């Protein structure tokens, strides 16, 4: 698998997990819908091969979750998000 496929797989796993999440807060649920839209935009950029080299940066998925305690408390979700951002930062410095 190439870097594009691996990265797309990680983002797809995040989306799949989001679909299984049961949250108590309506505000968090609404935010998660927007978050998923952003993840979908990233997947499209990967599929179109228009995603930029990371140059050591991250996609911001960790930051997008860190403001919501309910999302941070979900260990599986946190692991998926940090795994993706770390992979992009470290492995996708050039495609």
Could you describe each region identified by the protein language model?
Residues 1-31, 85, 89-92:
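Short terminal alpha-helical segments
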